[in-house]
Design a protein with these regions (language model features):
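Positively charged, small/polar-rich N-terminal and surface patches that mediate targeting and assembly
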Residues: 1-86
Length: 86
């Protein structure tokens, strides 16, 4: 999925964090799962495209999709992200 986000110019960078262990309630049951956390560096205009892509390709019925808007970022980095996703 990370490669597809980059190849499709939906994200400039995707960080993959393995070893995430989640405990949650689903359909009335307590579930425990090993998961992988993906963080995609992109722009706000790509939110709908990225969330739609993940909903189609993710094995979960309800994947966690959260956007964090940066309070500040280095200008050259921001320009690089913008150039990679257009």
């Amino acid at each position: 999925m990370a490669h597809q986000l980059i190849e499709g110019q939906l994200a400039a960078c995707v960080q993959i964090q393995e070893g995430v262990y989640s405990i949650y309630r689903w359909d009335g049951k307590i579930c425990e799962e090993k998961e992988v956390l993906l963080s995609a560096k992109t722009i706000a205009d790509k939110w709908i495209d990225i969330s739609s892509f993940i909903k189609i390709h993710h094995p979960y019925d309800l994947p966690e999709l959260i956007a964090h808007a940066p309070e500040k970022y280095e200008a050259h980095y921001g320009k690089w992200v913008e150039s990679e996703v257009k």
